[in-house]
UniProtKB/Swiss-Prot annotation:
Residues 903-915, 937-951 have a biased composition (Polar residues). The gene is ZNF654. This is Zinc finger protein 654. Keywords: DNA-binding, Metal-binding, Nucleus, Phosphoprotein, Repeat, Transcription, Transcription regulation, Zinc, Zinc-finger. May be involved in transcriptional regulation. A zinc finger (C2H2-type) spans 572-594, 746-771, 787-809, 815-839, 844-868. One of its GO terms (molecular function) is DNA-binding transcription factor activity. The keyword Methyltransferase does not apply. Belongs to the krueppel C2H2-type zinc-finger protein family.
Length: 1128
């Protein structure tokens, strides 16, 4: 029955193939040349020339595949191929010899014949119907020999030899018999590698694994056939099917490249072998993760994710497998492909898992891989685009790693956004994950941005920029600032023009120079101002500056920005003159001064061409002068001399602000100096905060000559005016600490030194360098710093102790270790703290010379060192008396000077203990200090006449209250200044003439005597004229007359201990004291009888109030329970 059906199928197939030739389906293409002659075996088919070879081959293949696919056994399929080959042989007679379509069809038929012959042995070749089929095949091959198809000839030879399995070399290989590799390779080269692949597939399909492995190994050992990846895939398949061969599986895995492995995995998955592909993928992936190799890692992880989900669709299992593979990874970069597949495959929870993976990766040691760390920060910012706080932290972290201008721009853009509160409802991750991530992110920051505003963040970020980025940033910032200033100038000029035009129209006046009436007056001035402001853009003759360090030229003020590129740690050099500085601010001011000098030269030249005022006159008009006697100013002569000398040395025009920083020369007459000292008055300028000797001592020699070259910009003024200090509980301005002249210049407090300075910083450098042993200098420095070291926050009570301690903070490593025989010092305090932990037993040695005591506790060491200096305090009290005597010599009365100086010596020579000084520093000042406020006008107007002085002081004396002569509390008990106490027990006004003080002498805070020219009759005043408000007190010290504000007594909790403020506990007295109480006390102790309402329980003091309450009948029972009424 099956044979009849196959015969019928063969007849129908022949008819369809003949119909293809007779009725062409495709367009006429390349026609075959021929006359339609038929060949052997072509009795069933007719010839024709109406169809092209390409169309015929295409239709032929479709029909043959259709009929062959209807059978699942090899013999009927061989019959279909026999009929197809005979029909093709007849039709191909008209086709050309070198037609590629014919070659393709013949090769396909030959390979199909070979694949079906694998199912038959040698014995079956001589039986019907296989014998007839093979004979027809050989006959057709003889007619098709002109095409020279290799595969067809190979199949014909194999049929003659008895079949595909009958070759003796192949039999030896399959049976694992020893054979020479050369003979095996020669046999393998004699056939098409595709035939060996078909043999291996047949053996694997029949589960003949040993024979298949033997054949596959022989093919792999062949140099040419081994390039075919199928044999490697087949070997892995065989090893996968035999678990005993695990060692061979791993060995061959190591020999296979990952790229080839990916192709093998994909081919295995196409064949439906998912488990084999998954095991192969994991076998290739895990060694890559363990070795940290990123070669083909993205492809392997992606293929693994697809195979894992195909084998097990569970999302939780998938995530667990991802974590398991991540634990085996040694390269942190593998988190990126894993996060990619997790985010794609696990929908909602995938984002949170990815954020957690990033947080875990940041906890690893990534110091050697900043690029990967930046990628992690950028990934977190990509995952959480709506969390502004995390975005800012990530942007700052990226900037700290890259130090690029683009990273800074991102930080600036994020911090310019308005702050947003974190909303847990709209967050992409859970609150737990976010708050675990925040401290991890902040670990990479140099500071916590929550405690800094954007101004501080910008300042520190710009300082961290690299050289090229810093120059680019400064260039862009300067261009933006110039554009903004130019725009504001144009707007202001436009407003001025509009105002001028309105004024001209309202008054009816016209501009004679404006003929057209369109252009207003201010337009010409606007052009001049814009030209002066932006000379670098308009004028082509812009001066060029050459950098001395790199020999590059820059236009105009670009040299200032270029200087940022040459900054080094602890050293800043001027790129124009080469001068070195240790402070960046001083270097920048010095460099800007160079540029402004040249700019002023150009402006002065332009103004001179326009016949306006010359540059020298403009500088003299705008500069501040030094006030001399009776208010006359001789600063012009001094400025002209200074300008001439400076122009000869530097060949540059000195700016107008230089005169403010010029010191008074030593050659000034003594009377002029005394007048400056006596008439000096404070103003509102404030200077830089005091720097210790260790920071400023090295730079003083090179910066002292440049004191007149630094400009005083608004930023410095705003920064300086915010510095205030507290002395004895009151806010004190620096002018109250330092003596100043009428122009606000600060005088050196040293004994016999007459130099004055414009800024406190310069004064401090001069005083600490030139007069390091002067007592007044030490006390002034002590007072300015409030006795506290700004590095270690240690409090000192002795000025010499304070100065000696500051000398130990040597720049740049200012934080030193106190341990015995340890000379380590550090720049930052946390470095010192880490170093201190390295000492197992901390023992600090006393820093006093010739003292070698060791202490384990710092408080004990501090107390011990203070005892050394307290013992030296009485010996050093003679120098202030000399200073006071030098101060008083300016008075005209020599007798009074002698008396006051002798009294002062007695007062200061009294030693005062340190504890007493601290206690008395909180006490209020005496009424003598109330004179400060009224004498303020005297000191501010230093050039007033003596008559005005007499009248001012007389007014002060008239308002001084009378004090009872027998009252000890009204005396000036103690005046504490700079930690020293001056005790004065003499009352201000007394009825006893022997106890009256000299009214021509007024004691000030520092113990000096203030001479007075008030007549004697104004000294005593009635008690009724006591002032209602405290007055100011004038202070005449060794370096001038100073006014101090009245002392305002602070609240008791600020200076008293709690035991003096809290209410004492009540004590029980003896019974005899209780019985001794008077009858009057017993009367007050009697209790008053009170009346209460029975219902609402309201209490009343008398019966009338209770009756009025009851008469209203509005009260209700407080506890109204029915059960109580019934029981009653």
């Amino acid at each position: 029955m099956a044979e009849e059906e196959s015969d019928q199928e063969a007849e129908r197939l022949g008819e369809e193939l003949v119909a293809i030739v007779e009725s062409p389906l495709g367009p006429v293409g390349l026609r075959a040349a021929g006359d339609g002659r038929g060949g052997a075996g072509s009795g069933n088919c007719g010839g024709g020339v109406g169809i092209s070879s390409r169309d015929y081959c295409r239709r032929f293949c479709q029909v043959v595949e259709d009929y062959a696919g209807r059978w699942q056994v090899p013999l009927p399929q061989l019959q279909v191929l026999q009929t197809a080959l005979c029909c093709f042989t007849t039709a191909s007679a008209s086709f050309p010899d070198e037609c590629e379509h014919v070659q393709y069809v013949l090769s396909s038929l030959a390979v199909s014949f070979f694949e079906l012959l694998l199912f038959f042995g040698r014995d079956e070749f001589y039986e019907e119907p296989l014998k007839d089929i093979l004979g027809s095949f050989q006959e057709c091959q003889n007619h098709l020999r002109r095409y020279g198809n290799v595969n067809l000839e190979l199949v014909t030879r194999i049929i003659r030899d008895g079949g595909p399995w009958e070759d003796p070399v192949l039999q030896a290989v399959l049976k694992a018999q020893p054979a020479s590799q050369e003979i095996v390779n020669k046999y393998l080269s004699s056939e098409n590698p595709l035939f060996f692949e078909l043999r291996a597939r047949y053996l694997i399909a029949c589960e003949r694994i040993p024979e298949a492995m033997a054949l596959i190994k022989s093919c792999i050992n062949h140099p040419e056939i081994s390039k075919d990846l199928y044999f490697h895939q087949a070997l892995f398949t065989c090893l996968f099917m035999s678990p005993v061969e695990d060692q061979l599986f791993r060995e061959h895995l190591l020999k296979t490249d990952c790229k080839s492995g990916i192709d093998i995995i994909c081919n295995a998955e196409k064949e439906g072998k998912t488990m084999l592909a998954l095991q192969l993928c994991e076998s290739f992936l895990i060694p890559q993760l363990q070795n940290g190799d990123m070669y083909c890692i993205w492809e392997l992880i992606f293929i693994w994710s697809k195979l894992q989900l195909k084998s097990n669709p569970s999302k939780q299992v998938f995530v667990d497998q991802c974590y398991q593979l991540l634990r085996t990874a040694t390269n942190v970069r593998v988190i990126f492909p894993f996060m990619k597949i997790i985010k794609d495959e696990v929908e909602e929870e995938g984002l949170q898992i990815c954020v957690e993976i990033c947080g875990c990766a940041l906890q690893l040691d990534l110091h050697d891989d900043p690029k990967t760390k930046c990628l992690i920060y950028k990934t977190i910012a990509h995952f959480l685009p709506n969390d502004l706080e995390i975005l800012r932290i990530c942007a700052l972290s990226i900037f700290f790693l890259e130090r690029s201008l683009e990273a800074y721009r991102t930080v600036e853009e994020l911090y310019k956004r308005p702050d947003e509160e974190y909303n847990e409802g709209t967050s992409s991750v859970q609150n737990r994950v976010r708050f675990e991530l925040l401290p991890i992110l902040k670990k990479g920051l140099f500071f916590d941005p929550e405690f800094w505003n954007f101004v501080m963040i910008k300042k520190n970020c710009v300082a961290l920029l690299s050289d090229k980025s810093a120059v680019r940033f400064l260039n862009e910032s300067t261009l933006e600032n110039n554009a903004g200033n130019l725009k504001r100038t144009e707007e202001q000029q436009g407003l001025d023009e509009g105002f001028d035009s309105l004024t001209d129209q309202s008054t009816g006046e016209t501009d004679p120079d404006d003929v057209s009436g369109v252009q207003p007056k201010g337009h010409i001035n606007t052009k001049k101002n814009l030209t002066a402001l932006s000379t670098s853009k308009v004028d082509h003759n812009v001066p060029r500056h050459r950098c001395m360090l790199c020999n590059k030229e820059f236009l105009g003020g670009h040299i200032v920005r270029h200087a940022q590129a040459h900054q080094k740690k602890g050293s800043f050099a001027c790129v124009i003159c080469g001068r070195k500085f240790r402070n960046r601010g001083l270097m920048q001011k010095h460099l800007k001064n160079h540029v402004k000098k040249i700019q002023r030269q150009q402006i002065a030249a332009a103004q001179q061409d326009d016949q306006e005022v010359t540059a020298l006159e403009e500088i003299n008009c705008s500069s501040s002068s030094i006030s001399f006697e009776n208010g006359n100013s001789d600063s012009k002569d001094l400025e002209v001399e200074t300008l001439t000398a400076s122009s000869e040395g530097n060949k540059e025009v000195i700016p107008e602000h230089v005169a403010e920083f010029i010191e008074i020369p030593i050659s000034v007459p003594e009377d002029v100096i005394e007048n400056v000292i006596e008439n000096g008055s404070p103003n509102n300028s404030l200077n830089n905060v005091f720097k210790p000797l260790t920071e400023c001592g090295d730079d003083y020699e090179e910066e002292e000559d440049e004191e007149g070259d630094y400009e005083e910009d608004d930023y410095d003024l705003n920064q300086e005016t915010s510095v205030i200090h507290k002395i004895n509980g009151t806010v004190c301005h620096p002018k109250d600490i330092y003596a100043t002249d009428q122009e606000g210049n600060f005088k050196c407090p040293a004994l016999g030194c007459v130099r004055i300075f414009k800024r406190i910083g310069f004064l401090n450098k001069h005083a600490m360098t030139v007069h390091p042993t002067d007592l007044n200098v030490r006390q002034t420095v002590m007072k300015w710093s409030k006795g506290k070291c700004k590095f270690c926050q240690r409090q000192f009570e002795d000025s010499q102790h304070f100065i000696d301690h500051l000398n130990r903070h040597s720049y740049p490593n200012v934080y030193f270790c106190l341990h015995f025989n340890c000379n380590e010092s550090f720049k930052l305090p946390f470095q010192l703290a880490q170093h201190t932990k390295s000492h197992r037993i901390f023992q600090a040695q006393c820093s006093f010379p010739e003292c070698h005591e060791l202490f384990e506790d710092l408080p004990l060491l501090y107390e011990h060192e203070a005892q050394h200096y307290l013992s030296k305090t009485p010996e050093s009290s003679a120098q202030p008396s000399e200073t006071i005597l030098w101060d008083v010599q300016t008075d005209s009365n020599p007798n009074q000077e002698k008396d006051s100086s002798s009294n002062e010596k007695q007062t200061i020579s009294l030693p005062v203990s340190t504890s007493k000084s601290r206690k008395e520093s909180t006490e209020p000042k005496t009424c003598i200090e109330s004179m400060e406020k009224k004498t303020d006008s005297l000191v501010q107007n230093g050039n007033e006449r003596s008559d005005d002085t007499v009248s001012n002081i007389s007014l002060i004396d008239q308002k001084m209250p009378d004090i009872e002569p027998n009252s000890e509390n009204n005396c000036s008990s103690s005046d504490i200044v700079n930690g020293h106490s001056e005790i004065e027990q003499t009352p201000l006004v007394s009825s006893d003439p022997a106890l009256k003080i000299d009214t021509n002498r007024i004691r000030t805070e520092n113990g000096s005597i203030l001479p007075s020219v008030v007549p004697q009759e104004h000294n005593t005043l009635p008690v009724s004229q006591a002032p209602s408000k405290p007055n100011l007190t004038s202070e005449h010290t060794s370096y001038g007359l100073i006014l101090t504000k009245p002392y305002v007594r602070p609240l008791p909790p600020s200076y008293l201990d709690e035991r003096y403020l809290s209410m004492p506990k009540r004590r029980k007295f003896l019974t005899d004291r209780v019985d001794a109480c008077s009858d009057q006390d017993n009367v007050y102790k009697k209790s008053v009888k009170r009346l209460r309402c029975g219902k609402c329980l309201t209490t009343y003091c008398n019966a009338e109030a209770l009756e009025a309450h009851l008469a209203q009948k509005k009260c209700q029972t407080l506890f109204g329970f029915d059960s109580d009424d019934e029981s009653a």
